[in-house]
Amino acid sequence: MELSGTVALVTGANRGLGAAYVTALLDAGAAKVYAAARDPRTVATDDPRVVPLALDVTDAAQAQAAAREAGDVALVISNAGISHGTAPLDDDAIEGARAELEVNYFGLLNVARAFAPVLAANGGGALVHMHSVLSWIHFPSSGTYAASKAAAWAATNALRVQLRGQGTQVVGVHVGYVDTDMTARVTDPKSTPEEVVAAVLEGIEAGAEEVLADEVTRTVKAALADDLAQLYPGVQARYDAVVA
């Protein structure tokens, strides 16, 4: 789809990757960007094309209300996400897993269900879901987060089939570490939000159904055809070093 002149909505738009999406869409010539956040007062902007919008993605009724208010949207970017950094056997694993699923999986579904009719009414448009390389490879320290992202990836693939008939481009974005507050304690190499957003917007305009936004993600995706014994030795070694 063409970004110039489009009307877009970005969830989790008040900081990090979401804020970078808003800026890049404006730079690409978007006519309007709904910057959705739990508290729209946290959206910092002086551009009249930006419309702060209250949206807690875990609230299905609020997602439906947002869809009614933003009825001119042709591009929806589901970016809102959280990570509790819990391993499956941690004391707080169930609490962390439920919270992550509420935002990363059920929240994504709430937004997709609310806006699919809006996209259909506006010519099909595009629905973009932010996933992670952890949709495919799983470290204990982020095991519950990875489960939520794997679930979201599965939902995206199903939605792509469901929405193809109405002309909606459904894009799954996979990326490793991005330099945001969520990864503040991570010492591994990170992509900048601007690098990731540029790759995604290029993919949208090219009609892509999947965007692999960094080299780590491309490497892991290529290795998925291998036996697990080939994919996981590095994960095991890293875990063993931590617990030693």
Predicted features, each with a name:
Residues 132:
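Residue(s) in the substrate-gating loop at a strand-loop-helix junction
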Residues 26-44:
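Conserved glycine-rich Rossmann-like NAD(P)H-binding loop of the short-chain dehydrogenase/reductase
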Residues 7, 14-15:
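Conserved glycine-rich cofactor-binding loop
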Residues 172, 180, 184-222:
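C-terminal helical subdomain
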Residues 112, 148:
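Active-site helix of classical SDR
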Residues 47-61:
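Rossmann-fold cofactor-recognition segment
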Residues 83-98, 141-144:
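Conserved mid-core segment of classical short-chain dehydrogenase/reductases
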